[in-house]
From Swiss-Prot:
Protein name: FMN-dependent NADH:quinone oxidoreductase
Cofactor dependence: FMN
Record note on cofactor: Binds 1 FMN per subunit.
Subunit note: Homodimer.
Annotated gene: azoR
Entry function: Quinone reductase that provides resistance to thiol-specific stress caused by electrophilic quinones. Also exhibits azoreductase activity. Catalyzes the reductive cleavage of the azo bond in aromatic azo compounds to the corresponding amines.
Top-level division of the source organism's lineage: Bacteria
Length: 211
C-alpha cells in the first residue's frame, strides 16, 4: 500500500496556486492508487520551529542524558522524520517567497536532515533513495534566461540540492510562473504566459500521478 507524504507551504489557504496544483496531483494520485494513503503536513498551519541548539545537540547526546529541553525538541523532530521515513513518495508544493523558499520549509528541512540517519554518505543510501519525489514550484514572476531578474531564483537550486543530498533520484519538478499576472495589473500583459504555464503544469502533474 503506497504512502504519499504531501508537504504544503503556502501561507494562503484560499487562492493559492501551489495548493490548487497540489490538489490536482492528489486527486489523480488517489484515482491511480485507490489503496494508497496520504500523509499531509501543512507548514503554514503548523509551522515547525527553527532548529535550536537543544534539539540539534540531542542528536549527539545519549537519550538517557537528555535535558527536558532536548527531550521536547526531539519529540517533534522524530515526528517529522518519521513521516518522511514512512513515505514511498513525496510531494512538495512550494511557492516562491522573496526569491527563495518559504521559511517554514527551510525549518522543516533543518528538522528532517539528520546526518547518519536521513542523510548518509554516500547520498544513495539516504532517506529518499528509491522514493518518487514531485515538486510543485510556483513563482509570481519569471526568472529564466533573458528575463530582467535572471539569476534571482534561489528557490529551485535550494530544493534541488536538498533532494540530492537526501538521495532522491526520481524527481520531477513542475514549475508554474507568472502566477501574479492575473491579480497584479502591472503584470497583466503576461497573463497568457501564466495560463500556458499552468495548463502545462496541470497536465504534467496528472501524468506523473497516474504513472
Amino acid at each position: 500500500m503506497p504512502n504519499l507524504l504531501h508537504v504544503d507551504a503556502s501561507l494562503a489557504q484560499e487562492g493559492s496556486t501551489s495548493r490548487s496544483l497540489a490538489a490536482t496531483y492528489i486527486d489523480a494520485w488517489r484515482a491511480a492508487h485507490p489503496d494508497g494513503t496520504v500523509t499531509y503536513r501543512d507548514l503554514a498551519l503548523t509551522p515547525p520551529p527553527h532548529l535550536d541548539w537543544a534539539t540539534l545537540s540531542a542528536a549527539f547526546t545519549p537519550p538517557e542524558q537528555h535535558t527536558p529541553e532536548q527531550t521536547e525538541g526531539v519529540k517533534l523532530r522524530e515526528e517529522l522524520i518519521g513521516e518522511l521515513e514512512a513515505a514511498d513518495e513525496l510531494l512538495l508544493s512550494l511557492p516562491m517567497y522573496n526569491y527563495s523558499v518559504p521559511s517554514t520549509f527551510k525549518a522543516w528541512v533543518d528538522q528532517v536532515i539528520l546526518v547518519g540517519r536521513t542523510l548518509q554518505q554516500p547520498p544513495a543510501e539516504s532517506v529518499l533513495t528509491g522514493d518518487r519525489v514531485t515538486v510543485i514550484a510556483t513563482q509570481g514572476g519569471s526568472y529564466g534566461v533573458g528575463t530582467p531578474k535572471e539569476g534571482w531564483d534561489h528557490q529551485l537550486p535550494f530544493i534541488a540540492h536538498v533532494l540530492e543530498s537526501l538521495g532522491a533520484t526520481d524527481v520531477e519538478l513542475v514549475r508554474v510562473e507568472m502566477t501574479l499576472a492575473p491579480v497584479n495589473p502591472a503584470l497583466a500583459d503576461f497573463t497568457d504566459v501564466y495560463e500556458r504555464s499552468r495548463a502545462a503544469g496541470e497536465s504534467a502533474l496528472r501524468a506523473r500521478a497516474a504513472a
